[in-house]
Swiss-Prot record:
This is Leucine--tRNA ligase. It catalyses: tRNA(Leu) + L-leucine + ATP = L-leucyl-tRNA(Leu) + AMP + diphosphate. Belongs to the class-I aminoacyl-tRNA synthetase family. It is an enzyme of class 6 (ligase). A motif ('KMSKS' region) lies at residues 629-633.
């Protein structure tokens, strides 16, 4: 064994050994419990960032630990390879998206391998290959035939200069990110998946996910948004047979309706605008706004009257219809009743446009109702009683809703209804780099699914990206085709699927990526029954990706592709962000030049707090910004490859796992990286020093050990239990590492020169190599092979605590006098309460601080302390 720790050589040798032996290859084995550990697959953007490294290190630690625990482990990897960034990169670099993507995959794969992750690379796939996306095209046609995929008009952001549809994030201050043109809202035909048919199941099954963070479950519940309310109609004043429908969760306030607002796209708005140029212009202005809910929530609320009136279903009074820019056509009926007195948004709108405000709820003990200023109690439904509501006066919320719903039902104008905030999933994207939608448009036969024998519809890869619309729509060789039904000339669909489609089932494909004849097979039942055992990814995916994946497993179950596997992810760990300090200089025009922390010298005070910073190249000051998530935009990232090249993968892994619990933010620290490297060098040197005296058999009992050595062995076996619990149940890797560091400190302090001590040293170092192997597998592999020639740490069992080693002849108890720590005593581990009390009262320190006073009471906390009250 060489005396110096050389990570590059050690890690190269370990990785070659794992490749040669197929250490990470997973094969179904009914004799073992399975453990499917999956970290969310990456988008191949070019290089790994520290967020990737943290995510995949967590997964690797859990995978390696469970393999050592006797599980049959699967840890796969693939590439979420479709998406807009590839088109943007193609535009900037003048290369086709496919070439850019495949090149990035090759580089990032090598980076992942250099980190020593135990990934079964035989299962690797990229979602942009026809071998993968052919199956989602196949599934699309099945769902289309069953009505679970359908076509309807959808609202999109339209760039009138580039003649293309923009994603919400491509609209900046109402303008196209590339052209700068004012964006319009347009309705175009799009394909939707009927996720609303599964809303109730998606909601109720959240209660069967105890292994998920409560925050994520709550976010999904809110997104699905189950509301119990009343759907009712306002008959049109000039044509009572025509009705305007609305849904409300506050039917108790129906007597306070003073106007109704409809979306700009609502048929009533269109009808009213036909002879009203001013209203038509306002509707067009509304259509130029964003289509995202977040945009609508924050923008200024505007409206205009339509001149149309409807009849209140209970009072018979005329109610004016307005167009409101805050009403979504895609939610409910595209219309809302407005009760300004008891809804803050309606109140502000009514004040702005001088509309009536009618109070219909009062709360005892509150201030008087004011038509000029909003008060929180106006919206209180728990304590309120109806007023100014005719026969409903005096009723509370529930009684009022029941009575009002019954009266509406009697008039055939409404009833109670459960409604969901969740909307059907629009999967059409007017972009190039995605999975082609397998539909052919025929003038005679309509929309025809592509037959199985013509799948996959292959996406052309050698294209030129201009940024103005999808190239597919300009490629007759792609879209010109024959109708599969009648054989006549037809046109292929040029929209592609939302990239969430690919990531909604990829975890199932890992079970059988080599199957060329079916989307999935029976191996899915082995690996995925009861859910993926551990799923790891950022909380930013809490809603869409995780919700769509849950939806897909239910869809695929119902079309007979898979059995009832239950929820797809049994346990979810949402890792925290990797953050680092930021530095910048102010430029002309208020812009900031962000400077990488590696290029800055920081001055700190005696407490280590930064007081100033200068740029290394010119020595001039830079501004210290906040600590923020590592990002390209703030230039505060650390290149994982540079870290690996300087310190090795094990140091990177050790620091990342030690710096914070996995679900908390990790603050980058160069000093912390240095500390991790020093620890590994120390561990190497400690093992080297032990082996210089020759190999010995590891101790298996306390026979022949001194008292101090027995204490060390006890600590060793206590550490085994703690680390196993930290890895498995608690998933607190930082405390596991801290426990091993404490153990090594105790090892260094113990005299281990005699024969029994040498055997204990052997047992300790073998165990430490295995305890740390899931986190630092390269050095763990190398040290264990030196300590146990011919043995392979990757095939070793995780160290298990020996109950006999944990037994103590004597225990130490702290002694307090009047609640203050004053000393310590050692007593037999079997000592009874009377013996412990007597020993404590005889302790010199206790006697001194009792100051001659008698003991009024002696409190014994077993195994911990004795408190004497004097």
């Amino acid at each position: 064994m060489q005396d110096k720790y050389t990570p590059a050589d050690i890690e190269r040798a370990a990785q070659q050994h794992w490749d040669k032996t197929g250490a990470a290859r997973a094969v179904e084995d009914a004799t073992k419990p399975k453990y499917y550990c999956l970290s969310m697959f990456p988008y191949p953007s070019g290089k790994l960032h520290m967020g990737h490294v943290r995510n995949y290190t967590i997964g690797d630690v859990l995978s390696r630990f469970h393999k050592m625990q006797g599980y049959n482990v699967l840890q796969p990897m693939g590439w979420d390879a479709f998406g807009m960034p590839a088109e943007n990169a193609a535009l900037q670099n003048n290369v086709p998206p496919a070439g850019w993507t495949y090149s990035n995959i090759d580089y990032m794969r090598q980076q992942l391998k250099s980190l020593g992750f135990a990934i079964d690379w035989e299962r690797e796939f990229a979602t942009c290959t026809p071998e993968y996306y052919r199956w989602e095209q196949w599934l699309f046609t099945r769902l289309y035939e069953k009505g679970l995929v359908y076509k309807k008009l959808g609202t999109v952001n339209w760039d009138p200069v580039d003649h293309t549809v923009l994603a919400n994030e491509q609209v900046i201050d109402g303008r196209g990110w590339r052209s700068g043109a004012l964006i319009e809202k347009r309705e175009i035909p799009m394909y939707y998946m009927k996720i609303t048919a599964y809303a109730e199941e998606l909601l109720s099954e959240l209660d069967n996910l105890p292994g998920w963070p409560e925050q994520v479950r709550l976010m999904q519940k809110n997104w699905i948004g189950k509301s119990t309310g009343v759907r009712f109609a306002f008959p049109l004043a000039d044509n009572p047979d025509e009705k305007l429908w609305v849904f409300t969760t506050r039917a108790d306030t129906i007597m306070g309706v003073t106007f109704v607002a409809v979306a700009a796209e609502h048929p009533l708005a269109t009808k009213a605008a036909a002879n009203n140029p001013e209203l038509a212009a306002f509707i067009e202005e509304c259509k130029k706004g964003g289509v995202a809910e977040a945009d609508i929530a924050t923008m200024e609320k505007k409206g205009m009257p339509t001149g149309i009136y409807v009849t209140h279903p209970l009072t018979g009074q005329q109610v004016e219809v307005w167009v409101g820019n805050y009403v979504l056509m895609s939610y409910g009926d595209g219309a809302v009743m407005a009760v300004p007195a008891h809804d803050e948004r309606d109140f502000a709108f009514a004040l702005k446009y001088n509309l009536p405000i009618k109070q219909v709820v009062a709360v005892d003990g509150e201030t008087a109702f004011s038509h000029e200023a909003w008060a929180e109690w106006y919206a209180d439904k728990a304590k309120g009683k109806l007023v100014n509501s005719g026969k409903y006066d005096g009723l509370g919320y529930e009684a009022a809703v029941d009575a009002i719903a019954a009266d509406l039902a009697a008039k055939n104008l409404g009833d109670k209804k459960v409604q969901f905030r969740l909307r059907d999933w629009g999967i059409s994207r007017q972009r190039y780099w995605g999975c082609p939608i397998p539909i052919i448009h025929c003038k005679t036969c309509g929309d025809v699914p592509v037959p199985d024998d013509q799948l996959p519809v292959v996406l052309p890869e050698n294209v030129e990206i201009t940024g103005a619309g999808s190239p597919l729509a300009k490629m007759p060789e792609f879209y010109e085709c024959q109708c599969p039904k009648c054989g006549g000339d037809a046109r292929r669909e040029t929209d592609t699927m939302d990239t969430f489609f690919e990531s909604s089932w990829y975890f199932l494909r890992y079970a059988c990526p080599d199957n060329t004849t079916a989307m999935v097979d029976e191996r899915v039942a082995y690996w995925c029954k009861g859910g993926i055992d551990q799923y790891i990814g950022g909380i930013e995916h809490a809603i869409l990706h995780l919700l769509y994946s849950r939806f897909f497993t239910k869809l695929m179950r119902d079309v007979g592709l898979i059995g009832d596997l239950g929820e797809p992810f049994a346990n979810l760990l949402t890792q925290g962000m990797v953050v680092a300090p930021t530095f910048y200089r102010e430029l002309d025009g208020g812009k900031k030049q962000w400077i990488n922390p590696a290029d800055v010298d920081v001055v700190t005070d005696e407490r280590g707090r930064p007081t100033g910073a200068t740029l290394k190249t010119d020595g001039l000051p830079v501004v210290i910004g906040g600590t923020e998530k590592m990002s390209k935009s703030k230039n505060n990232g650390v290149d994982p490859q540079a870290l690996i090249d300087q310190y090795g993968a094990d140091t990177a892994r050790l620091f990342i796992m030690f710096a914070s619990p996995p679900d908390q933010s990790l603050e980058w620290s160069d000093a912390g990286v240095e500390g991790a490297y020093r620890f590994l060098r120390r561990l190497w040197k400690t093992t080297y020093d032990h082996l210089q005296a020759g190999l010995v058999a590891a101790s298996t009992s306390n026979d022949g050990l001194s008292s101090a050595q027995a204490d060390l062995r006890r600590k060793l076996h206590q550490t085994m239990g703690k680390v196993a619990d930290d890895y498995g149940r608690r998933k607190q890797f930082n405390t596991a590492i801290a426990a091993v560091m404490e153990l090594l400190n105790a090892y260094d302090k113990c005299d281990l020169k005699d024969a029994a001590g040498r055997a204990l040293a052997q047992e300790s170092l073998e165990s430490i190599a295995l305890l740390l192997f899931p986190i630092v597998p390269h050095i763990g592999q190398a040290l264990y092979a030196q300590l146990r020639p011919g043995a392979d740490a990757g095939n070793a069992a995780f160290p298990k605590a020996d109950p006999a080693a944990l037994k103590q002849d004597e225990i130490e108890l702290m002694v307090q006098v009047n609640g203050k720590l004053r000393g310590a005593i050692r007593v037999s581990a079997e000592a009874d309460k009377a013996t412990i009390e007597a020993t404590a009262l005889a302790n010199e320190d206790a006697i001194k601080f009792m100051e001659g006073k008698p003991a009024k009471k002696v409190i014994v906390v077993p195994g911990r302390l004795v408190n004497i009250v004097a």
